Amino acid sequence: MAKFHFEKGHMVPVPSHSIIPERDLGSAPVLECSHLGIQFGGLKAVDDFNLTIGRTEIAGLIGPNGAGKTTVFNLLTKVYQPTMGTILLNGQDTSGKTTAQINRMGIARTFQNIRLFNNLSVEDNVKIGLHNHNRYSMASGVLRLPGYWKQEKAAHERAMELLSIFHMEDLANHKAGSLPYGAQRRLEIVRALATDPSLLLLDEPAAGMNPSETAELMENIVKIRDTFQIAVMLIEHDMNLVMGICEGICVLNFGRVIAKGTSKEIQENPAVIEAYLGRSRTKED
């Protein structure tokens, strides 16, 4: 059966040689957090966090500054080891895993502050994300044996295909640091996708973007989900973005979940209005 992906508002066929992976689209969730928490001294930064994310769901994590949102991402990626609770990724317990192991298991992440290698080319930044797929030996790399060149050719093709999905292939030889802000954000997402995740974590992806760039970002997030058939979880303060594309939203306040539901349910929840949305409306008024 032919595969398709989202392109400028339309579904178009995916080439037979595409790097877009075949995925098991069973009903099992991609992520299950049960009673997750972490304590720093006497401070419970995250407490009794429970969340399930479907295999191709776009989920939002919102809350006031200091609510614990980025700490949740740090727990999921094992920047911090939880002091309580469990995390299942694709049904596998992640207890005791390192950040690198979590990445190989299927979680990729972007950060609030862009973390590109500014002096490297756009293509080389994407190739860094492909390092998990390199299979040549150290000797092959040092001596430039045929196995090395075969892997390099494959990496180039994969990087260019990923860039083409976001119309960035013409920028492949540009220095990453020379790109406009919005393009740097896209490149960071492309590099994360190069690791072949089943769950993509986006930490404030619209930060610093103008309305036009934010609208393009919204389309790109939907494109990512539809093209790669993965789940996306994002932290974001732009409520138009969150309410516009997130199918499920979780609200944190002081490290605890105060509400979960659809965008309509969240907007009508009194606790959310008081803790988060109400503050935004007060500022707008």
What are these regions, as identified by a protein language model?
Residues 2-285:
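Glycine-rich phosphate-binding loops of nucleotide-dependent enzymes
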